[in-house]
Every structure is written in structure tokens, then in C-alpha cells.
Regions:
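Well-ordered beta-sheet/strand-loop patches within structured domains
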Residues: 1-215
């Protein structure tokens, strides 16, 4: 059962325990809207001691009826138009805030391609019911999530009982271990005239990386 939120427990929240900001100033309008909308869905969430936060559960159905717009999304190794493009920037920024406050990460996976707003290995992809970002509050006091996007920058700040950090600070580092040059793959298309080529997906550079947490 989810621990009950009480006034006494909320009074233990006395300051910031982590904060992380990413930029989306150059995003298309639909994506900008989705980032701000998704941020508003998790803003004000309280994660009680021992409780596991689920990003997908807080966001709810990612549909046009729910208010999300069309924007570019990663589908395998391609970028396609789809409902909810931009949601992964919010989950990735939240992942960084969770790492910096030493939350216990219960579920997280990186994108199939590098993202523009974070170094390789620092992101957290979410998709449907299959891919989620989940973390557990390891502290004896609740954690409050503040999330806000202003169409340029997305900030996620976590508040809690500052003494729970034990005077420690946490830094996250990404080290690129290899760079994979993009390849051009040509495939026959019966719908095109002979000798005509169409660029379906621009080649992108791949990376392998290691991520470290320093206390």
C-alpha cells in the first residue's frame, strides 16, 4: 500500500535536495508544448518514504485526447512523427534530478540514439507500458517534485529533508567510450522511379558510454 501523506510528514520537507535543468529552446512548437505539459503532470508529486515513483503512471495516457501533440519521436533507429514527442526530455531531466538526490533507480533505459539535450548515457527513455522511469525514495521523509518548463528551459527540482543526504552531494559524469561512425544503407523501393533516391533517415553518429556517480 502507498504510504499515507500526512501534514506531519510534509513538514519535514525543508529544502532542495537536487535540481537539474535542460534546454529545449530550439524545439518545434508541438514538442515545446509536450515538454511543458508533461512537466505540469509531475509537478507537485510527493514520493513518500519507500514509495516507488512511476513516470508513466503520473503522465497517464499519451494520446491526443489527453492533450498531447504531434512531435518527433524515436522509433528504433528512426525519428518519426508521433503523439507525445518531448516526453523523454522530461523523464531524462527527472532521471538526472533523481540521481543527484541519490534516489534508488528501479527502472531506466537509455534511448536507441543519442539525444541533443544530454550527454550519452545520461538519458531515460519512456514508451507506452513497456519502458518506464521508476525510482524509490530511500529516505525516512517524503520528497516533493517541482517541474516547470518555460518554452526554453526545463527545470526539475526535488525537495526533501536536507539532513537525509547526510551532508553528501552527488555528481554524475558521462564518459564516451567509443564513437560509431554513421553508415549509409541503400534499400530498393518499388515506389520510386529507377535511378531516383530518397533520404529516409539522415545518418547519425552513435556512441557507447559509461556513466559514473561521484559522492
Amino acid at each position: 500500500a502507498t504510504p499515507k501523506i500526512t501534514a506531519d510528514s510534509l513538514r519535514q520537507i525543508n529544502g532542495e535536495i537536487s535540481s537539474y535543468t535542460t534546454s529545449y529552446a530550439t524545439s518545434a512548437e508541438g514538442r515545446k508544448y509536450n515538454v511543458g505539459f508533461a512537466a505540469s503532470k509531475i509537478n507537485g508529486t510527493v514520493v513518500m518514504p519507500g514509495e516507488t515513483f512511476s513516470y508513466n503512471k503520473e503522465i497517464g495516457p499519451v494520446t491526443a485526447n489527453a492533450g498531447f501533440k504531434n512531435a518527433g519521436i524515436y522509433v528504433g533507429n528512426k525519428v518519426e512523427d508521433g503523439i507525445g514527442g518531448g516526453l523523454c526530455q522530461v523523464s531524462s531531466t527527472l532521471y538526472q534530478a533523481a540521481l543527484h538526490s541519490n534516489m534508488t533507480i528501479a527502472q531506466r533505459r537509455n534511448h536507441s540514439m543519442a539525444v541533443a539535450y544530454l550527454a550519452p548515457g545520461m538519458d531515460a527513455v519512456v514508451y507506452g507500458t513497456v519502458l518506464d522511469l521508476k525510482f524509490t525514495n530511500p529516505y525516512p521523509n517524503p520528497v516533493y517534485i517541482s517541474a516547470y518548463g518555460d518554452n526554453s528551459k526545463l527545470n526539475i527540482t526535488m525537495y526533501g529533508h536536507t539532513a537525509d543526504l547526510g551532508g553528501k552531494t552527488y555528481k554524475i559524469f558521462s564518459e564516451t567510450t567509443s564513437v560509431l561512425s554513421p553508415k549509409t544503407i541503400r534499400q530498393p523501393d518499388p515506389n520510386l522511379a529507377e535511378g531516383v533516391e530518397e533520404l529516409e533517415q539522415k545518418p547519425v553518429t552513435g556512441y557507447t558510454s559509461k556513466t559514473y556517480k561521484q559522492t
